[in-house]
Amino acid sequence: MNLFDKIQAPKRLLRDLQSGDEVNWYYRIQEVTKKKTKNGDDFLDLTLMDRTGRMPAKIWNRASEFSRLLRAGEIYRISGEVKDYKGKRQMTVSHARAVGADDRDCDRADYEDTPSFDSAALLQRTFSLLADHLTRPALIQLVDLFKKEHGPSLQQAYGAQKIHHAFAGGLLQHTHSILQMVLAIAPHYGLDKELLLVGALFHDIGKTAEFKTQPALETTLAGGLLGHVVISLTMFLDLKNRIADFPEDLSTAIQHLIVAHHGEKEYGSPEVPKTPEAYLLHLLDLLDSRMDIFDEQRKNGDGKKLFSEFNQALGTRVLLAKE
């Protein structure tokens, strides 16, 4: 046993780490990629995770050695220092080793890729909301089938890999948020509330098949070749076709909401919004994703800088803290 192994350290969850902290604790490596610096030297680009969140990390020295040791999805005891990089916390890793039988202070429950909130309660509220506001028999049947087929996966799924709601249960939070906004805004413009509710439920459900989280978060074959918009459309058609005499006009309207929700073809929509309901769903989807990005920028700031670095998705820097 080397000196690194003998060091006794208190639990250091990622949420609590600040720039300047020296760390010797267990983390799950969610992603690991070997890259090169501008000078051509190898380094490892990592994403560390625990039940409180994620943090980017780098290994600058002995990258080739560690690239043979480290596997995405596994838990390691990691030594390093948290630093500020462009207004965000990032760990520079100096040592890492695999977890062994003697690591009794490693609680594997801290590294399960599961929602950090009561996702079962939120899932129940989501379907209760739909039940309270849907009156058309075809839509009620459709949502009942959805709940049985896709409810469990919706409860656990990531909303994205990196940009917004990029955590277990993120897709459920995103979906529920849009449903609530539909109820608030659709009546103001005299839009078809029930159509929008069902469109919101289905618009991103393909993400349950676009990503997998075990052993590590990555894109599936279907996700890479088809994308979540096409998968969502396929999942809707599968359920719709099980319902006798489902109105074709209603089916087409829902399909349009799914395929147009990214707004522009260059952003992944097969079609642009051509109905007010489709346009509103696009705007609500965009709004909720952007609000989550603001939230993440502020949560992941190092607590010292007033503004973040330029954020590509937002097209600006984010005010992190008041002076």
Map each language-model feature to its residues.
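OB-fold nucleic-acid-binding modules
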Residues: 1-23
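Divalent metal-coordination and catalytic microenvironments
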Residues: 27, 73, 178, 285
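OB-fold single-stranded nucleic acid-binding module
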Residues: 32-42, 53-109
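Short, acidic/hydrophobic/Gly-rich beta-strand patch recurrent on exposed beta strands
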Residues: 45-50, 213
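Extended, charge-rich, solvent-exposed interface segments
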Residues: 90-158, 231
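A short mid-domain helix/strand-loop element embedded in enzyme catalytic domains
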Residues: 138-181, 202-206
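Divalent metal-dependent catalytic cores for phosphoryl transfer on phosphate-bearing substrates
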Residues: 163-164, 173, 183-300
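N-terminal intrinsically disordered, cationic/polar leader segments
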Residues: 282, 304-317, 321-323
